[in-house]
Swiss-Prot record:
Membership in a protein family: Belongs to the RecX family.
Physiological role: Modulates RecA activity.
Any GO BP: regulation of DNA repair
Predominant localisation class: cytoplasm
Name this polypeptide is given: Regulatory protein RecX
Lineage of the species this protein comes from: Bacteria, Bacillati, Bacillota, Bacilli, Bacillales
Protein's cellular compartments: Cytoplasm
Span of the signal peptide: none
InterPro entries: RecX_HTH_1st, RecX_HTH_3rd, Regulatory_RecX, WH-like_DNA-bd_sf
Length: 267
């Protein structure tokens, strides 16, 4: 059976040691492994002893990777598992690492959800649904997802949504109905519910500048008319033009007035 003939501190890492058996380098181990097995010069190690040491050292290596990964920011159990799998840590060692991290508080899903909630409310314009999706993607338990999504909805100031809606409103062009639809769609994509969107939009002024709308309608009319005059003529051309402008959100009477003004359709 092999005997421990030397244990020396590694030159580049004072917390790791080189283990020599029968004058030959066997493996590197960390301080915890050294202490855990009470290794010292002269120890005789069986095959079973070596297997235990190797397994424990593999666990310690995985734990080192996990703690280093967790040092940059909060992580979920799923994220840590995936990180360790990329480094080819065995499933049994991963299970031990995760158990240790949960027990010692390195992984805390409630703390993760709370921190993400506060950060997103404070620094982003995203609504509760985007927050929910992020928690699900990170592997947070369903009960916590529902609990913290509800907290997100309660704590996000309606004023922030109103400011965002007003900002979006000023970015949208076109008739009133079209602008309303565009703002609602943008807010839905950012993760807000219909209820919150409707409440936030109650006091917004969607009435566009009349001169701006007149100019936009004139441009749309010319564009649509040129498109359809290649295929249609007469009454059919007029109806196709009106239908296209109605789909864009313009009022029927406004369209007819602009067409007459432009010399298109009925006089």
């Amino acid at each position: 059976m092999p005997k421990v003939t030397k244990i020396e501190v590694q030159k580049k890492n004072k917390e790791r040691f080189n283990l020599y058996l029968d004058e030959s380098f066997e493996m590197g181990i960390d301080m915890d492994t050294l202490v855990h097995f009470n290794l010292k010069k002269g120890d005789v190690l069986t095959a079973a002893n070596m297997e235990d040491i190797q397994k424990y050292e593999h666990f310690r290596f995985g734990l080192h990777l996990a703690i280093q990964y967790l040092s940059y920011r909060k992580r979920t159990e799923q994220e840590v598992v995936q990180h360790l799998q990329k480094h080819e840590i065995s499933e049994s060692a991963i299970a031990e690492v995760i158990d240790y991290c949960n027990r010692e508080g390195y992984i805390d899903h409630e703390d993760y959800a709370e921190s993400l909630k506060n950060t997103m409310i404070r620094t982003t314009d995203k609504g509760p649904e985007i927050f929910r999706q992020k928690l699900i993607k990170a592997g947070i338990e369903k009960s916590l997802v529902e609990n913290y999504t509800a907290k997100y909805e309660e704590e996000q100031p309606l004023e922030d949504v109103e400011i965002l809606a007003d900002k979006l409103l000023h970015q949208k062009k076109g008739p009133k109905k079209k602008r309303i639809d565009k703002v609602k769609q943008s807010l839905l994509q950012k993760g807000y519910s219909f209820e919150v969107i409707n409440e936030a939009m109650q006091n917004l002024d969607f009435e566009p500048d009349s001169e701006e709308i007149d100019l936009l309608l004139q441009r749309e009319l010319e564009k649509v008319f040129r498109k359809y005059e290649r295929k249609y003529e007469g009454r059919q051309l007029e109806m196709k033009t009106i239908e296209a402008l109605l789909r864009k959100g313009y009022e029927y009477d406004t369209i007819k007035d602009k067409m007459r003004e432009s010399g298109i359709g009925d006089e």
